[in-house]
Amino acid sequence: MKKFNSFFVLSLLMVPSLISNAQEYLRGDVNIDGHVSLSDVTCLIDYLLKGSWPDAVDYECVDLGLPSGTLWATCNVGASTPEEFGDYFAWGETVPKDEFTYENYKWWYFDENGYRYISKYNTKSDFGPVDNKTELEPEDDAACVNWGTSWRMPSLDQVVELVNSCTWQWTQRNGVNGHLLTGPNGNSMFLPAAGYRDGSSLEYVGTYGNYWSRSLYSYLPDRVYCIYLDSQYWDSEDISRYYGHVIRAVRVSQTR
């Protein structure tokens, strides 16, 4: 009983700092509409239980002065400089691979007649059992798995905010085509035109790029939202889940 009481008192002493840091987490990843997603709450509960972000790595991020306070990584997942493409992932997969096909995508399966169904993140019964999951859970988020729980793939709200709040300039960095994004506060980051992988081919490098979000396109759940960019255009788009695209993560345990 004495041991239990000591633990209880220690836990109470820890609560104020835990709550303070939890508030920082929520401010860093709150959606534009003021709500926090279920997957964000999952990360937060994990933090509250452990009292820290044990696997967080100090990857560099930039404060663009965005209204939400979101901090974006300066490099893609798997890259060490802003102009490097980094690793290519299918949506909801956390390990890079050499070939991206319908058949080897983790969350699709086929019946004996060759019809394709979705095993996770599905909002329509035409595609199989419905789970109504519309955002990647942390264990399926390549940024979270590869960089630690302080990092996530961006939500659709964060993508839209980035598109609408920054000025975009098509340019080169060390010979690599891409967009220089300048935020409201004058800080900037570079998104290389990394192309995409389909099958074993790397397509359209230097011409355009797609960057995954963690948000499902719920009207057609075999598609998800991404950042699309080329020399003349940039916006949020929806695209098939099985392709190999790069990831620019957002920081979720720290704000400006």
Annotate each language-model stretch with its function:
Residues 8-17:
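Bacterial N-terminal signal peptides
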Residues 18-22:
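Sec/Tat signal peptide C-region and signal peptidase I cleavage site
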